[in-house]
């Protein structure tokens, strides 16, 4: 679980950096299911279903932070699975955002590294959380 914890921590750091950039540059969420307004980005980050055009909302990041801290300790196995599912939702979120897809098509040095790294770490988080084998009781 320590590898998952480290990947999740790195992903959380990238997410906070992209959230900061999205708020500063007023990048609203823009998915096939809805569109935000640039002036509402900071407010939308507090809505658990919205977020910004570059980051998940604060409640999701708070849940990830709690799960990550639990993984560094003795967490039940369901925490790893939950973090894997969170990684899957981040993959979907990243790829559904117009600003992220645009940064892949037209790379720039400020946005693309964050979006690529966030997507890769989300994939790693999903794989390491969901591909874990359960150990039989009494074994190390």
Regions found by a protein language model. Give the residues of each.
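Short amphipathic, positively biased membrane-proximal segments
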Residues: 1-140
């Amino acid at each position: 679980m320590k590898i998952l914890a480290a990947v999740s921590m790195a992903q959380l750091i990238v997410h906070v950096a992209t959230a900061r950039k999205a708020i500063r540059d007023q990048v609203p969420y823009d998915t096939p299911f809805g569109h935000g307004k640039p002036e509402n980005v900071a407010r939308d980050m507090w809505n658990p279903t919205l977020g910004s055009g570059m980051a998940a909302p604060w409640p999701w990041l708070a849940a990830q932070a709690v799960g990550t801290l639990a993984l560094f300790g003795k967490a039940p196995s369901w925490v790893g699975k939950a973090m894997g599912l969170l990684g899957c939702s981040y993959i979907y979120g990243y790829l559904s955002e117009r600003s992220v897809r645009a940064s892949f098509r037209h790379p720039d040095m400020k946005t693309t590294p964050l979006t690529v790294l966030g997507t890769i770490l989300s994939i790693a988080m999903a794989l390491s959380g969901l591909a874990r084998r359960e150990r039989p009781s009494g074994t190390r």
